[in-house]
């Protein structure tokens, strides 16, 4: 179920403050955050936000298509190693 329109999007206050200060100073350094739950606002477009995935910070360059999504959607927490395959069939191909 999605969030009520009357409530508005959720963004952590400390992240908004960091984005506004980066905009004022024309700072291009990545903004480091642990807030995966924050919604991407139009103010974030063009900035690089380093989102923590539980192990490291993954740089996410915010584009226009990302507005309305959560930051955590672009910083995966699990590494996909691939599905198990038939090793006999894979080895016999030439």
Curated annotation (Swiss-Prot):
The keyword Nucleotide-binding does not apply. GO terms for cellular component: cytoplasm; small ribosomal subunit. It holds the Pfam family Ribosomal_S19. Coiled coil: none annotated. InterPro entries: Ribosomal_uS19, Ribosomal_uS19_bac-type, Ribosomal_uS19_CS, Ribosomal_uS19_SF. One of its GO terms (biological process) is ribosomal small subunit assembly. One of its GO terms (molecular function) is structural constituent of ribosome. The keyword Transferase does not apply. Residues 83-94 have a biased composition (Basic and acidic residues). Residues 75-94 are annotated as: Disordered. Belongs to the universal ribosomal protein uS19 family. Protein S19 forms a complex with S13 that binds strongly to the 16S ribosomal RNA. This is Small ribosomal subunit protein uS19.
């Amino acid at each position: 179920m999605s969030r009520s329109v009357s409530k508005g999007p959720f963004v952590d206050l400390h992240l908004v403050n960091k984005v506004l200060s980066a905009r004022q100073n024309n700072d291009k350094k990545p903004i480091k955050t642990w807030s995966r739950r924050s919604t991407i606002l139009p103010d974030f477009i063009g900035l690089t936000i380093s989102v923590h995935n539980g192990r490291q910070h993954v740089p996410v360059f915010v584009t226009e298509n990302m507005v309305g999504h959560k930051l955590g959607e672009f910083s995966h927490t699990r590494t996909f190693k691939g599905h198990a395959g038939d090793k006999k069939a894979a080895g016999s191909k030439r």
